[in-house]
Amino acid sequence: MQMYSQIRLEGPILRVIDLDVELAYYQKFGLIPIRRFLGENGHEMIELGFDVNTTPGSQSDNPPILTLMHDSSASRPSHRSAGLFHFAILTPDRESLAATFVSLEKQGIQFVGFADHLVSESLYLQDPENNGIEIYCDRPRELWQFDEYGHVQMDTLALNFQSLLSELYSNNDDMIMNESPIKESMAFLRGAIIGHMHLKVTNLAASTDFYHEMLGFDLMQTMPGASFLSIEGYHHRLALNTWRSRAGISHKEGESGLEQFTVHFTDRASYKRLLPRISKSSLHTAINNIIVTDPDGIKMALVCDGQ
């Protein structure tokens, strides 16, 4: 099923309790406030993006990487609640990923994991309010492997740090002595985009069916407790798992964490083909977009150019 063309994910909205702490954390990524405003619910909103004057590859009309919504009275979700597992920031190349790792490490940012997924290489973090973050780069598409059913081959293997850091260091002695030209301010120096979203759900079959059958995302891979879905042959734009949330608690309005994420269509024909598939019970309109609510109460905005 190849329903869509010209589609992109846009930065998630995170409902945060301590705005100052969260803002300071993400500024270490090189993100800066690009717009401040009051949301429809009266909460202060800050859109964060890269400085187009210092980040080659960033464009002035790029959507924000992330939006923080301040709600000091938000409740903290249970570890078994549905919601955000991580949002994933895609760097343009391997050198950018290596430079971002060194830059963030020099600023004291703590990493919680590293992985080689065959199709990509990844760094994992958690922000001060335990929102998961993946920073990754893709391997060239010609290196991706598919089975006879068109499912992409992915795995979770140890990341080869020596190979990754060799993108920055001229030799092993420099690596040992940490003689890198990378400075603290050089995270995401060539820009980045949102590559995918990974959600915690309570019923994998129901959520997979929702995104696959109702929204038309292609099922690219399954593994115990997880599904990976995509559009246009990418390895995954959306991942779902029940590793800690199986038969757990649906997302509740007013909880900290993921407020919503956005799928942006630049092709009106694809957008129009999608709308009749969506159950009216899961859909409502908002200013300039349509909000779809999945079986766990997670909200996804659907936006189209010229809407």
Task: Outline where the language-model segments fall.
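Hydrophobic, proline/glycine-rich low-complexity stretches
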Residues: 2-19, 27-32, 47-51, 61-62
